[in-house]
């Protein structure tokens, strides 16, 4: 279910958008406002996934509303739907942080397609970030950005891409033994290669030193088998 806030001063268009998306297409919970001031209040109270807004509205226009929202909320998807079609208007919207600009007139199916494409993209980005972020004792590994964050001290350490790859594999299989050749294959695209194996030992020693701040965390060597990230 997509929670959608429509901010539109045209009563008939607002009704058509709400009815079509909520009742005909389905999968939407639609909240409506008639101007930017009401839109800001609804955004605060309802916390929508998507805001679809006109620009030329009374009290606070679309530009003013988005500027206010983007001061504290960079996540909500914002789409302008407007008859203002000059390049300057379009550029102004994107400078403020909107995600898309649909020129009036348009049909509800077009709006639905834009909304769902942006929601899918946003959820995919969030899923990727969450998938590659791991809690390891007092640490948080962000494998996407090769950083290790100490939640206790607030210190952030940049590690190498290879170190991030290795720790990522171990964190995915926390408290389980991961075969050395599996790590070598994923990180170096080789199996039991001597030089890659020695490089792995060097990286493991560096990671052990980085994780030493938390006694409950350690990387164990299981002789003849592989490595194990142990956490309590």
Feature locations, PLM:
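Short, Lys/Arg-enriched segments at the junction into DNA-binding effector domains
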Residues: 116-175, 181
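Positively charged, aromatic-enriched patches within helix-turn-helix-type DNA-binding elements
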Residues: 155-159, 165-215
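Receiver (REC) domain active-site loop signature in two-component systems and cognate sites
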Residues: 57
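Short amphipathic alpha-helix used as the core "switch/output" element in two-component signaling
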Residues: 41, 63-74
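Basic, amphipathic DNA-recognition helix from helix-turn-helix-like DNA-binding domains
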Residues: 72, 77-135
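Helix N-cap/capping motif at the beta->alpha junctions
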Residues: 18, 32-41, 62
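DNA-binding patch around the recognition helix
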Residues: 126, 131-134, 158, 202-232
